Structure formats: C-alpha cells, structure tokens
Amino acid sequence: MRLTRAVTNPPWTVDVVVVGAGFAGLAAARELTRQGHEVLVFEGRDRVGGRSLTGRVAGVPADMGGSFIGPTQDAVLALATELGIPTTPTHRDGRNVIQWRGSARSYRGTIPKLSLTGLIDIGRLRWQFERIARGVPVAAPWDARRARELDDVSLGEWLRLVRATSSSRNLMAIMTRVTWGCEPDDVSMLHAARYVRAAGGLDRLLDVKNGAQQDRVPGGTQQIAQAAAAQLGARVLLNAAVRRIDRHGAGVTVTSDQGQAEAGFVIVAIPPAHRVAIEFDPPLPPEYQQLAHHWPQGRLSKAYAAYSTPFWRASGYSGQALSDEAPVFITFDVSPHADGPGILMGFVDARGFDSLPIEERRRDALRCFASLFGDEALDPLDYVDYRWGTEEFAPGGPTAAVPPGSWTKYGHWLREPVGPIHWASTETADEWTGYFDGAVRSGQRAAAEVAALL
C-alpha cells in the first residue's frame, strides 16, 4: 500500500481525524485509507510509535518502550510481515536467576526454585487465578460472576484472602510490577483476571518460549510504526498535539498545534488516562470524564547495559532474572550476536528511580545487574535508560494499572463512542490488552466502527 495524495495546508477537511500515531492510531488510519477514506493523523510528539521507542546502546538498536511479540499476537505479526520487518527469538538458553531476600540462585523454566511448600502454594494460586480469569468475559468483565466482589478487592488483597505464602506474594509482586508498573495493592483483581484472560492465560502471558516474550524485533519495534507511517506519508502530522475537539451537526472540529481539521468522525487513539488533556465541547458525559481519572498508567522504566560480550552465557546463564530488590526486578539478554556486544535489559521500578540523576540511576541499575550476574556487570561499554514518567504525552508505564472499583463503575464507557468520537488504544482491546497486538486490534476495531457509518 502506497498513498501519494498530498495533504493541503490547514484548515483541512477529511473524512476521519485520528488522534495519536502509535500502533492503534496508525492501524486505524491504514484500514480507513485502504477503503478510500480521507484520513489525517495528528501526533503530539516529534515521532511516531507511541509507547514504542527505539534508541541505541553501544550502537545497537534498543527498545526503550515495548519490546516483545509472541505467538497468537496475530495482528501485530501480520502488520510486521506485511511491512517486511523480521522478528528474532529472545535468547533463553541457560539457567535463569532469582534473587530472593538477599541471595541469588539459578533455576530452569518459568517457575523459580522454591521450597516444596512454596511450589505447592504457587501451583494452588495459579489454578485459582486461572479459574477466575476463565470466568471473566473480556468484552464485558462487569458481567462476570462475582464481578463486583472481584473489582472491589485489589490483587494484593485477594492474595491475602486466599492465604498465599510470602514467597507466592513476592513472585506475584514482581509479575505485577513488570506487567502494570504498580504494586499488587494498586490493581483491581477483576482487572488482573481480565488482563490474563485477554492474553490466553498465565503461561502465555509470562513465558518466553510460546509466550508473550518469545520474539523481538532486531531493529526495534518502532520500525513497525515508522514503516506504517511512511505509507501514510503527509497524512501524518507530527508536533500536532490535539487540544480541543468540538462536536457539531456535521461531525467534529479537531484543533491541533498544527491547525484545525473538519471531519465526520474522530478516533482518539491515546491511553484513557490522557484523554483529559483534550478539551471536549460539549463536554463528555460524566462517566467518560470519571473513567479517565480511574484508568491511570503504571510507572515503569527501562535500563540497558552493553558489554564486549554476553559474559553471563559463558557461565551458563540465560540473562533472564527475577529480583525482589529495587530498582531492577526483571532482566533479559537482548544481545544481537553471541560474540557481542552483550546487552542486558532491565525493567525498572520507576517510582524511586526516575527522579534520580543519571549517575545514581546508572550506579543502582549496574549494582542490580552485578548482584545477578557478577561484578563484570559493573563495567559496561555503555549504559542507557529511559524514564517513561518524564514523557509529556502518555507518561507512565506500558499500560493502565486499573485500581479497584473502576471496571464495574466505568468500564462500560471505555470504548463506547460518543456521537462521532470513537476510541482506540491497547487498553480498549479484547485480546492482548497492554501489548502492541492489542493496540493494532483496537485501531482496526475503531476503523471498522467508523467505516460502517461513512
């Protein structure tokens, strides 16, 4: 698909305006242009990709935002294939490491070595959690049996109610931090169950092999967004933050930093929490306004360290680790080649990390890498981190950390159109919520809604 028709100077008149040039917005724009509709995409940043951002460490592409793509993520895989962007398996050969209460030990597989009591308890919790998740309708979680009860408690409260051991609670805390960028007490049990159901289960969500972390894009996931935007050409306007959307009889007037556009419809493809940055006239119904305040982003950052070789492999380690010590709580080996450079990527608890100066962030992250893989990690060729909490647009973590009480009160309005205003973002997806695949699916769904009305 190659679109060549030029976009004129403002004010513009098009069929549809899309707000946001992340995976959701670009997917929506591509679907509509394929059908012959005139589309204009407004993006507030000076780049496309949304929560995908590819930087460099030691000259190697490094995903500062979302990194992984896995089986059953068919929408984003199809998009990458169409655009000619390859994936490569995430390195997983060797022993994993778990750092627990001040000591580190190795294990193989998904579940760390715990005591017999701990393993039995983890198995029990997985069974109970999966049973609850299977009973949650992803498209309408408020209709689940015991929906109100599940939504009124946090994941942390649920773990205490079912008398999880301290080891089990610690493992679930690590999972919660890397998944939503928050603590178990911050996220609704109903949201946690729905999220797992949308991924196809805990194994699919957490595993590398046959799971959500199975593959990555060697040149960075932002390539996918850049290639999609290149096809749309001048229809994508950067540095065009949308400030206001007016509804009227003919559709909408969308006011951005680059000018105004008249359209029959608008697709707002940004995280729900950041809808509040746009002024709507007439105002959105109260339920929509409340939803934006009850769908906060988590807090998650990333740290990379590059070495001459992936030295941990020589000791039989995979580079994957879990830790209950801040700031790095999970790591992956994202080295491009076995002969170097060796690159460790760590997910970081942003709450205490983001406010530190770079020297202290570097020191703390390298200290964590060294406690997992040895003192050689203290002397990298290069170190880079990215603090998502400092972003002007969509700051925070990879997805929403929805607190107790939110789904049953406000979930109905998450993607329900308001006249000509339609909604997209990975948070609104029924499959792979929180992932690029969910974002692509949400954009395609919003495009189908609008196309049916054009």
UniProtKB/Swiss-Prot annotation:
<dbReference type="GO" id="GO:0016491">
    <property type="term" value="F:oxidoreductase activity"/>
</dbReference>
<dbReference type="InterPro" id="IPR002937">
    <property type="entry name" value="Amino_oxidase"/>
</dbReference>
<dbReference type="InterPro" id="IPR050703">
    <property type="entry name" value="Flavin_MAO"/>
</dbReference>
<dbReference type="InterPro" id="IPR001613">
    <property type="entry name" value="Flavin_amine_oxidase"/>
</dbReference>
<keyword id="KW-0560">Oxidoreductase</keyword>
<dbReference type="Pfam" id="PF01593">
    <property type="entry name" value="Amino_oxidase"/>
</dbReference>
<comment type="similarity">
    <text>Belongs to the flavin monoamine oxidase family.</text>
</comment>
<dbReference type="GO" id="GO:0005829">
    <property type="term" value="C:cytosol"/>
</dbReference>
<keyword id="KW-0285">Flavoprotein</keyword>
<dbReference type="GO" id="GO:0005886">
    <property type="term" value="C:plasma membrane"/>
</dbReference>
<dbReference type="InterPro" id="IPR036188">
    <property type="entry name" value="FAD/NAD-bd_sf"/>
</dbReference>
<protein>
    <recommendedName>
        <fullName>Putative flavin-containing monoamine oxidase AofH</fullName>
        <ecNumber>1.4.3.-</ecNumber>
    </recommendedName>
</protein>
<keyword id="KW-0274">FAD</keyword>
